[in-house]
Amino acid sequence: MAPTKQQSQKGVKKGGKKKTTDPFSKKEWYELRAPSMFSNRTCARTLITRTQGTKIASEGLKGRVIQLSLGDLSDKTQDIFRKFKLQVEDVQGRHCLTNFHGMDLTRDKLCGMVLKWQSTIEAHVDVKTTDGYTLRFFVIAFTKKQEDQKSHAYAQTTRIKKLRAKIVEVVQREVARCDLKSVVQKLIPDSIGQDAMNEASSIFPLSGALVRKVKVLKKPKLDLGRILELHSEGKADEFGEGVPRPDHYEPPVVNAV
């Protein structure tokens, strides 16, 4: 007996097989450029969907935040435990111009610094730079044994308060008189933490002091000229180079345009 129409269509899916498309075929790569404070300028790449209709790719990239190790931003492999956040401020061609957005330490570095038989001092302070950025600094310090201490390096509560006040004073002094570019240049070798340890050691011996974290709380209004200045090195950049001309060169006269 021949099958009925209902039996012949049993097990057949509606619509047939869907066409599969590669999701990466609609995306394009953009290069991320770090500010001039870092030696490795072209540090990473990022993906974005191509411009379609009113959805512009460059506008979708603005505000994107990436986190990179200092080892990727410079040639100093011994400082890979420092992580810097960069935020895309402007897009020029296929280059994303970024700006400093924060700093942090890796988890294993923090866990390796915290030891028993010592006191841990933590301090935080909000400081405003000369160019209008409000930054929050988190500093961590550790005590070490004095000559009359044998088994531990604990500090008294009164000394811990004095140490914390001295650390806050040093951070405010070093940051308030600098712009953002100078602050980042101090964060790369952590000269702020070193200065805090040197001055606070007069109160109680310290084995180390580090800027543990930096947050950007407030930014000034976006200024494209300031961003371009932050990415300039005082010489020709990758976006264009000067063409050598002979002395007394005059461009040819064009008859028609």
From Swiss-Prot:
Return the Basic and acidic residues bias intervals. 238-250
Pfam families referenced in this protein's UniProt entry, alphabetically: Ribosomal_S3Ae
- Specify residue ranges for compositional bias: Low complexity: 1-10
What superkingdom heads the lineage? Eukaryota
Q: Which GO terms describe its molecular function?
A: structural constituent of ribosome
Identify the GO cellular component terms for this protein: cytosolic small ribosomal subunit
Tell me where it resides.
Cytoplasm
Positions of the UniProt region annotated as Disordered: 1-24, 238-257
**Keyword annotations of the record:** Cytoplasm, Ribonucleoprotein, Ribosomal protein
Task: Note the InterPro entries from the entry.
Answer: Ribosomal_eS1, Ribosomal_eS1_euk
Question: Mind listing the GO biological process terms from this record?
Answer: translation
Please state the protein's primary subcellular location: cytoplasm
Subunit details: Component of the small ribosomal subunit. Mature ribosomes consist of a small (40S) and a large (60S) subunit. The 40S subunit contains about 33 different proteins and 1 molecule of RNA (18S). The 60S subunit contains about 49 different proteins and 3 molecules of RNA (28S, 5.8S and 5S).
Family stated for the protein in its record = Belongs to the eukaryotic ribosomal protein eS1 family.
Q: What is this protein called?
A: Small ribosomal subunit protein eS1
Origin species, per record, is Taenia solium (Pork tapeworm)
- Organism placement in taxonomy: Eukaryota, Metazoa, Spiralia, Lophotrochozoa, Platyhelminthes
